[in-house]
Amino acid sequence: MNLLKTQLKGDRVLAGKEAVAELYKTGYFGRPKDDGLELSLVEAAYLQSRGKLDIELEGKLLGFRAFFEQASLRQQNFELKYIVYKDLKERGYYVQPSAADFRVYPRGSHPGKSAAKIFVHVLSERQPLSVKLLQESVASAENVHKQFILAVVDEESDLTFYEIKSASPKGEMPEPFPAVKADATFLEDRVIAWDAEASGALYSRGFYGKMLDPERLQLSLVESLYLFSRGVIVVRDRKGKIFSFDEFVEKASEIEGSFLRKYSAYKALRDSGHVVKTGFKFGTHFRVYRKVESIEKIPHSEYLVNVIPEDYEFRLPVMSGAVRLANSVRKRMLFAVEKGEEVEYLDIGRVKM
């Protein structure tokens, strides 16, 4: 059998005009050029492994091993991209290289018939992932109406696919603020509201805090500052001195270094109509409810939320654990990216391709 003759040039493999009919028009491999067909390194490796072509470098024929080693020298993450490309092809997708790594066409479609629907970015489980770059990649995909998929290759070359999208969660809770300012005391690492009427209203209609007894309400630090900022409670120290907003923030930040970041996300979620409670049992900052109609019949929370700074770098094993836990308890995993007074959300979930 005569194989197509190709040449390795830089980070591309070049084939003659006959390859256009044999490879592009039948399988949509490569990109037609005036003098033939240009293949990416992963496309060429895939085709070579299936006995479709010979690859030469400076007149020397390269076997699969030699070409794979050359390709790995010429393109960062080549072996990872090859693993993902091969997997997607074997699932029946048409796949083409892109700036994101790959663009993937819907099953039953191909280039020329419809547009690609998915951008796939490839990483090793050991590589950090910048939140800033991730948000830019997701925005670029969403701006052209594409789904953004992160393909993570673990040390045993198994693949996990994550869909990542921006989110704008909206809740349905009215704010049941009492008409009076309730007195509260900042103890060691929490606040207690003493007014029975205000405590009952905040707990039963807004799911704030936890009742210490039938008349008094325990509040977390973020809950307390939010209610303080709304003029619902007056917070004093244990000697009776009234805190200013800045004094409260300073004391809370001494207790918890990331307090102000957590508060920014808490405030954004409450302002958008959600009930926000601690996510400690799930290993996250918050669990979030879209609506709680009755304390006696609390529904399942919709989201788990971790709050991160905009210069954060994901460690993929940690991200994987958070997403897997959220999926296992039928919740969405949101990462709230704190940007000063603004909060943006990334919704990350595992998907099957």
UniProtKB/Swiss-Prot annotation:
It catalyses: pretRNA = a 3'-half-tRNA molecule with a 5'-OH end + a 5'-half-tRNA molecule with a 2',3'-cyclic phosphate end + an intron with a 2',3'-cyclic phosphate and a 5'-hydroxyl terminus. GO terms for cellular component: cytoplasm. It comes from the Archaea. The active site is at 289, 300, 331. One of its GO terms (molecular function) is tRNA-intron endonuclease activity. SUPFAM superfamilies: tRNA-intron endonuclease catalytic domain-like (SSF53032), tRNA-intron endonuclease N-terminal domain-like (SSF55267). GO terms for biological process: tRNA splicing, via endonucleolytic cleavage and ligation. The keyword Lyase applies. InterPro entries: tRNA_endonuc-like_dom_sf, tRNA_intron_Endo_cat-like_sf, tRNA_intron_Endonuc_cat-like, tRNA_intron_Endonuc_N, tRNA_intron_Endonuc_N_sf, tRNA_splic, tRNA_splic_arch_long. Its EC number is 4.6.1.16. Keywords: Lyase, tRNA processing. The keyword tRNA processing applies. Coiled coil: none annotated. It is an enzyme of class 4 (lyase). It holds the Pfam family tRNA_int_endo_N. Homodimer. Endonuclease that removes tRNA introns. Cleaves pre-tRNA at the 5'- and 3'-splice sites to release the intron. The products are an intron and two tRNA half-molecules bearing 2',3' cyclic phosphate and 5'-OH termini. Recognizes a pseudosymmetric substrate in which 2 bulged loops of 3 bases are separated by a stem of 4 bp. Belongs to the tRNA-intron endonuclease family. Archaeal long subfamily. This is tRNA-splicing endonuclease.
